[in-house]
Regions:
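Short runs of predominantly hydrophobic/aromatic residues within well-ordered alpha helices
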Residues: 156, 190-203, 225-228, 273-276, ...
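Well-ordered secondary-structure scaffolds
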Residues: 223-224, 394
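Short alpha-helical
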Residues: 151, 223, 286
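Acidic/histidine-rich
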Residues: 212, 219-222, 372, 378-379
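Conserved nucleotide- and phosphate/pyrophosphate-binding catalytic cores
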Residues: 232-434
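Short, positively charged and aromatic/hydrophobic N-terminal segments
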Residues: 4, 9-15, 20
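NTP-dependent nucleotidyl-transfer catalytic core
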Residues: 17-219, 229, 236-241, 254, ...
Length: 434
């Protein structure tokens, strides 16, 4: 009898698990399929709420530079996915918290920026969200908020009494953003130590004023996010939710969004659509499938099918580059970048969308040394590096090797006031007379 009971009970548990799985909300299901989902404070309850109605969720972004780089793109793609499934994203641009600086993952105190510079950065960063997110449908259009609106107006004594009383030093010392710095005997300012409380307060403000039920962030933000859900529970006796995405690890071991040329910026005035396209085109073979799920809108099942059927990894890289560039810069820019690459690499021609180096016509009349051309435009950092590259036959002008370090650039090198400068196999520039 006991064996029969055990058999029935086990099968019942399996059926319940299957039912729960099929009931999972489509937004959260796709989060999992794309690899966006790392941790959640209460996944079942959040799924249940999302099945019943649309929600608002937010992600916070520091405004320490004029542009976000591609390391922030996964978070923006999650906001875009929220819209796809009928939910409303809130973009928190941290005009207040950027005055402090998030210590997470940092070895030292960040450079403190003036409010005027932060405001300029916010204005510049906002352009990217308006390009990637859909602003045309009122129900799911992004809400932009700046936490300076409430953080800069706080009364210190009142804040300590009403908010600070809900946090213990004991618990705050256990969070990685604090613990790692202290374990390494690196200084952590009182200002930075307060960052996690301010982030929790942000969530409370958005919960109270915007009915925001969900905060999303990278896995390094888990402690800060949980602080927010705890504060909301203590202040309102209601439940809010936190969700993290995994930190992106590259097969090469390098950091996402950083290359030998510098950061891969999202703003067009800091990185051309062609260079952006090339970044994705040069993805490590081992990362292509993951990046197709992370950074394109192609359905996950379709990606699996494409990856199974298409054996040419370079065609998959072009697909990735086209889709990622389309999302940020538009369809025309993606097509133009692909055609430029084709003209440059396959046809031996000069692509129209290559990064440009402009030289004054008077310099050409006098003649400019090849060494100066390369070093002044920071293609390589020193003339000694340029000399070594020339000795190794690393430079070409219009596909002809430059083998003389004393070469002088003059009008004979130009065709219709331009020429193609190549360094190695993957770096190409359009040198133009102005």
């Amino acid at each position: 009898f006991f064996c029969i009971f055990l058999f029935i009970y086990n099968n019942f548990c399996i059926i319940v698990a299957l039912v729960k799985n099929t009931m999972k909300n489509k937004f959260l299901q796709e989060m999992q399929e794309r690899g966006y989902l790392n941790q959640c404070t209460n996944l079942d309850k959040l799924s249940e709420i999302c099945n019943k109605s649309s929600i608002s969720g937010y992600i916070g972004f520091d405004c320490t530079a004029r542009s976000l780089h591609v390391g922030s793109l996964l978070q923006i793609m999650i906001l875009k996915l929220m819209q796809k499934h009928g939910h409303r994203p809130i973009v928190l641009l941290g005009g207040g918290t950027t005055l402090i600086g998030d210590p997470s993952g940092k070895d030292s105190t960040r450079k403190i920026l003036e409010q005027s510079m932060i405001n300029k950065n916010i204005k510049s960063i906002k352009k990217v969200f308006n390009k990637i997110l859909d602003t045309s449908i009122k129900k799911t259009a992004p809400i932009f908020v700046d936490n300076a609106k409430w953080l800069t107006k706080l009364n210190y004594i009142q804040f300590l009494r009403e908010i600070g009383s809900h946090f213990t030093i004991n618990k705050m010392l256990t969070f990685d953003s604090v613990k790692i710095r202290l374990d390494r005997e690196q200084s952590l300012s009182y200002m930075e130590f307060n960052y996690m409380i301010l982030q929790a307060y942000d969530f409370y403000q958005l919960f109270k004023n915007n009915n925001c039920l969900l905060q999303i962030g990278g896995s390094d933000q888990w402690g800060n996010i949980v602080n927010g859900t705890d504060l909301i529970r203590r202040m309102t006796h209601k439940e809010a939710f936190g969700l993290t995405s995994p930190l992106i690890t590259l097969a090469s071991g390098s950091k996402m969004g950083k290359t030998e040329k510098g950061a891969i910026w999202l703003n067009e005035d800091q990185l051309s659509p062609y260079d952006y396209w090339q970044f994705w085109r040069n993805t490590d073979d081992r990362d292509v499938k993951k990046f197709l799920k992370f950074f394109t809108e192609i359905e996950p099942k379709k990606i699996e099918n494409i990856y199974h059927e298409e054996k040419n990894i370079n065609l998959l890289k072009i697909l990735l580059a086209n889709e990622a560039t389309r999302i940020l810069h538009g369809k025309d820019a993606a097509k133009k970048a692909e055609q430029t690459a084709k003209d440059t690499f396959e046809s031996g021609g000069i692509g129209s969308d290559l990064p440009e180096i402009k030289i004054d016509s008077k310099k050409i009349e006098r003649g400019i040394s090849f060494l100066d051309l390369i070093s002044e435009n920071k293609i390589l950092s020193s003339k000694s590096e340029v000399r070594r590259a020339i000795a190794n036959r690393g430079f070409k002008i219009n596909d002809k090797i430059v083998d003389d370090e004393k070469k002088i650039i003059n009008s004979n090198d130009f065709k219709e006031s331009k020429f193609k400068l190549s360094y190695g196999k993957k770096k190409h520039f359009l040198v133009k007379i102005i």
